[in-house]
Amino acid sequence: MKFMAKIELSRHIPLVTLIVLVLCITPPIFATKNCDFPAIFSFGASNVDTGGLAAAFRAPPSPYGETYFHRSTGRFSDGRIILDFIARSFRLPYLSPYLNSLGSNFTHGANFASGGSTINIPKSILPNGKLSPFSLQIQYIQFKEFISKTKLIRDQGGVFATLIPKEDYFSKALYIFDIGQNDLTIGFFGNKTIQQVNATVPDIVNNYIENIKNIYNLGARSFWIHGTGPKGCAPVILANFPSAIKDSYGCAKQYNEVSQYFNFKLKEALAELRSNLSSAAITYVDIYTPKYSLFTNPEKYGFELPFVACCGYGGEYNIGVGCGASININGTKIVAGSCKNPSTRIIWDGVHYTEAANEIVFSQILTGVFNDPPISLDRACYRK
């Protein structure tokens, strides 16, 4: 009987060995759980601004924010932006702007983004110019100061210590970047040729990477970095450069090619950075493709008039007067208001997207299909 038991046991040894081998060979990314980011830190321009520029200067006028918040919150949309949907996907609150000193809660992160921000240091800034003084380098400096101050507040204790991130959140958080659009726009409206704007891209990307490195050196490890969208589909470009050659869908072809070149160089630089920063999980997020698909097949998503801004007044693209601004026509004050149903439009104000469009783009980048490496949002803490 003992002999037979030994025979039976020996028959099972190969199977046990096989199971152990399979478990050992399986890549860790498939064996581990989804990322549970306790906080988000955001850097960039208007696409991810939740009120930074508004805190420093003034909020965009009504009807900005009308769809979801029913008031202007400093977001450049009729409602929520992609960053809001990302936060909610992790059951985190909407991010408070770093610059907002009243009513802010930084327990689960902070937003350093500011509408009108650039990667390169701008020459013409608000209030006299059009660009934000809070370039990416300034946002990095603000983040560095934020870390320093949270340590001080944490040591002091008290009620304010309950409104800041825990110390280990900085290394466990998701770091989101969405910037670069304004660097390209400066060239377009600065009378540069397409070739001249393209020539500035390598320098812009190099500065981008340097700032990402700086933030990595402060403890950031999980990076979710958006490329830029199709600039040539924006009504503000179509209206100001009417002679631009259009593609078959109506977008300004050469301006989109600049966006694609920027994305190519950024993706290339991030691949190199990924190989150099062994502790970092760096995901390049292709925003261009899902945004462009809205213009190539608007009916699929329930949109109409893809190149006409929902909020504005006058002209072919409804941006003769900016959203929320007013104009006197024959003694009558006309306020540039919202279209009847923003959920049927892609573009909100000539530049920025509606909440409806933002939600669709979010749902597509969420899966990782458009990302490099192809990692979904809930796996963005892992290297692949």
Curated annotation (Swiss-Prot):
Induction: Accumulates within 5 days in response to Sinorhizobium meliloti inoculation leading to nodulation. Repressed in nodules exposed to nitrate. It is found in: Symbiosome. Its EC number is 3.1.1.-. Residues 1-31 form the signal peptide. It is an enzyme of class 3 (hydrolase). InterPro entries: GDSL (IPR001087), SGNH_hydro_sf (IPR036514), SGNH_plant_lipase-like (IPR035669). It holds the Pfam family Lipase_GDSL. Expressed in root nodules (at protein level). Glycans are attached at residues 105, 191, 198, 276, 330. Its main location: other. The keyword Cell division does not apply. The keyword Hydrolase applies. This is GDSL esterase/lipase ENOD8. The active site is at 46 (nucleophile), 349, 352. Has lipase and esterase activities. Probably involved in root nodule physiology. GO terms for molecular function: alpha-L-fucosidase activity; hydrolase activity, acting on ester bonds. GO terms for biological process: lipid catabolic process; nodulation. Belongs to the 'GDSL' lipolytic enzyme family. Keywords: Glycoprotein, Glycosidase, Hydrolase, Lipid degradation, Lipid metabolism, Nodulation, Signal. CDD domains: SGNH_plant_lipase_like. GO terms for cellular component: symbiosome. SUPFAM superfamilies: SGNH hydrolase.
